Amino acid sequence: MKQELSLLENQLSYYRSQADYYSRLSRSNGTANFGISGRSQINIVAVRTVSGSMGELVYEGIIMTVHLELREGEGRLLINTEPKIGIDLQTSANTAILVAEELTNQSLKTTDVILTVIADSETEILDGPSAGAALTVALLAAINDETADPSILMTGTINPDGSIGKVGGLIEKALASARFDAKEFLVPYEQSVAVVYKTEETHPAPGLTIITTKPELIDIEDYIRDEGYELDIIEVNNIVEVYDSVILEE
């Protein structure tokens, strides 16, 4: 758990510095003279820690809803949460704005982007950057006046070139998606498999018990099926693939 938390912290630091740089660069070069109006909604999947049956901390997937609004303004990014949610969306949202501007050839420097994140309870989220792909889809949908399919969920960071970056907590996110009755779960390329740690107990002698933990590579879709759910796990490389998969046809 410490290793994965360290990885998530490093991701946060990296994407914060990266997005801040590109955000300043992009907004200084915009050309639009008036703002854009639009709305969209998308569900995001994240991971939080909860207390296990023995009092230990364990990971748990959580589904939250993001309402996105574009309105004429000053190029601000405004993030609200209901109720209080500890999540860093600022970095991934800034990168999402850059990618959306590039793909649509629209400047958002005179448009305010307002995100409202709704969860079922107060919580601390570990991996805000993994919502980057979903936020980019929401932005594109609002600009294009299109609708994202609520039965398709996703996880993945968004890079300035539009590629989808790898994330952690795939098992927990996939299980939460399945329980949400999603039909598809989009994951970064080569992340349809994950490592789980299985505990084995042996008794080599009377009164002696040896417990070992071994890593095992599993197919996430098979794991979800073994848990009693059906969920298609689909690998994606870039935001264009994601958008084409998610947007509902008129």
Spans of features found by a protein language model:
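Peripheral, non-AAA+ core regions of ATP-driven protein-machinery
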Residues: 1-250
